[in-house]
Amino acid sequence: MQLFAFGVNHHTAPLDIREHVAFSEESMQHALHDLVGHQLVKEAAIVSTCNRTEIYCNTDTPDKAVGWLADFHHLRFGDLEPYLYRLLREQAVKHAFRVASGLDSMVLGEPQILGQMKNAVKSAEQAGTLGLLLHKMFQRTFFVAKEVRTSTEIGACSVSMAAASARLAERIFGNISEQKVLFIGAGEMIELCAAHFVARHPVHVTVANRTVERAEALARRFNAHPISLGELPDQLALHDIVVTSTASPLPILGKGMLERAIKQRKHRPVFIVDLAVPRDVEAEVAELDDVFLYYVDDLADIVKEGLDNRQGAVTQAETIIESNVVDFMHWVATRQSVPTIRALRNQAERYRRHELARAHKLLAKGEDPEKVLESLSSGLTNKFLHLPSSVLNHATDDEREQLIELVNRLYQLHHS
């Protein structure tokens, strides 16, 4: 078995590919059970965010594991294959460390990915698909991420996706304080966005969510008006700015709904940021003249602001990561000797029990205890040394030299 990571992210695949391989919260447990249930992998954890879907696993059949991703999402492997990355052993470990530290994010140094990876581990634990190897790797991953964030300035002055959404809205409207804002969803991303937009004092804020109770909870925090998703067709036209990020597998806003809203607004423009993967807004909406539609990938230029000033922090972070990769792979290597050590100890225990039982019988017959102890010790010595001696004596000339060197090292022999 070996560590293996594979998937797609914003570096390798466009949004229309990423949304087809995303896993919803509801499908995660089924996906993990399906992957491990097919005995393609021994362990597995799935990280699925707006920017990446990647699978960390312990497997002897990497190619079959990769093929599972396409099969699970009912895709042709040939359509997905050009966008996939595959990382084995130390490269998989290094990738996990970089992702958790925010070095692989669209927003360099952003902290949200660490929480998302922790959620992925929690899901794998609940599904029973997290074994010793992945558990240890993720433990070290979270340790490294903490060290990178506390020892470097990697997160300093970073522009989050939420902040970028607000900045982009300001570029369109100039002043958000004169606009009405609608948030669709009530998860972490919407909560972050709401904080940035509300800080700019919009005229009115509405929160729409499938579960009205969650909309009400978020609305109370930001002095907003809660509504259900069913009210969107009537409410959409009242808002100038729409920010959406739900876990819906199907679009929330279609072209027809936006056309009706624009007509009601007498063609006053609407600014929409869709941070969801899969997308909440149909791609055809971009064809409407009075809609400024931005998807998550469209925010890349804004979130890269200030990147040049943090290159020193990136170098420091990479050094920390490289050191920890070496340490972790050393631990993995030592694990390979565990079965042999266990077998050796079990063999020794069998010898001990056999000789001890023999000694008890001799004592029961009234044999001299000193002679019994002598027999016990010589019996153990002979049993321990018989096989190594036999292997050395029957080895070929080429084998013998290596075996002699190995025995000298194992037993720390010094020839006088």
UniProtKB/Swiss-Prot annotation:
The active site is at 50 (nucleophile). Keywords: NADP, Oxidoreductase, Porphyrin biosynthesis. Possesses an unusual extended V-shaped dimeric structure with each monomer consisting of three distinct domains arranged along a curved 'spinal' alpha-helix. The N-terminal catalytic domain specifically recognizes the glutamate moiety of the substrate. The second domain is the NADPH-binding domain, and the third C-terminal domain is responsible for dimerization. It catalyses: (S)-4-amino-5-oxopentanoate + tRNA(Glu) + NADP(+) = L-glutamyl-tRNA(Glu) + NADPH + H(+). HAMAP family: Glu_tRNA_reductase. During catalysis, the active site Cys acts as a nucleophile attacking the alpha-carbonyl group of tRNA-bound glutamate with the formation of a thioester intermediate between enzyme and glutamate, and the concomitant release of tRNA(Glu). The thioester intermediate is finally reduced by direct hydride transfer from NADPH, to form the product GSA. The record marks 95 as: Important for activity. This is Glutamyl-tRNA reductase. The keyword Transport does not apply. The gene is hemA. NADP(+) binds at residues 185-190. Substrate binds at residues 49-52, 105, 110-112, 116. One of its GO terms (biological process) is protoporphyrinogen IX biosynthetic process from glutamate. Pathway: Porphyrin-containing compound metabolism; protoporphyrin-IX biosynthesis; 5-aminolevulinate from L-glutamyl-tRNA(Glu): step 1/2. SUPFAM superfamilies: Glutamyl tRNA-reductase catalytic, N-terminal domain, Glutamyl tRNA-reductase dimerization domain, NAD(P)-binding Rossmann-fold domains. Its EC number is 1.2.1.70. It is an enzyme of class 1 (oxidoreductase). Belongs to the glutamyl-tRNA reductase family. Homodimer. GO terms for molecular function: glutamyl-tRNA reductase activity; NADP binding. Catalyzes the NADPH-dependent reduction of glutamyl-tRNA(Glu) to glutamate 1-semialdehyde (GSA). It holds the Pfam family Shikimate_DH.
